[in-house]
Amino acid sequence: SGGEAPASVEAAADFVGALLDAAGVQQAALVGHSWGSLIAMEAAARFPDRISHLVLVGTAYPMKVSPALIQASLEEPEKALRMVNVFSRSTLAAPPSALGPGTWVFGAGMALGRRVLRSNPVVNVFHRGFVACDSYAGGEAAMKNGRCPVLFVLGTADQMTPPKAAQGLIEAARAAGRTVEVSRVPVGHHQMTEAPDATLFALRDFLQRKAAPALAA
């Protein structure tokens, strides 16, 4: 999309709110992966009456990013893409026909990353996203201020956002009295492509449940 890319999780969350307004959507379920999970979590806290369900896929807090990866994303984006594609997956050799005949997992990931980089010729969105993740410090407050049910979808072999790095958010959500569910899938950081059915079914089952009435803040 056009326009300036958000430079922080908070700015991106406000963009979500503006998008709901522009689309005339009064209430929505938010599903976010990685950086998107932080954005969805923050948006659910900022607009608690408008978010019915929150799904955090491949999340962690704090979501610290390796300084080497941040530097590479700015100075050598192609190198950073290779690093992410290696560490984001539990295997680069998908089981036969698991993702369709002839699927090239690494190549597809690289192609997608290059497309994202080309999507904004003014801003290096790759680097901007890493910095936003690394600097976000509002996780505990977001879990306290949000009210909707939360589902965590975590990859047991995730090296980018290890499951243990989400435990603080899980505990914060429970301490705030929110309904919390955790689904663990035996894959890496790309849950949507490495375990598409398990991820889809977890989302489906969670979203089909009617949200409990929101508690007053």
Locations of the language-model features?
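Conserved alpha/beta-hydrolase catalytic His-Asp/Glu region
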Residues: P62-V65, Q71-R147
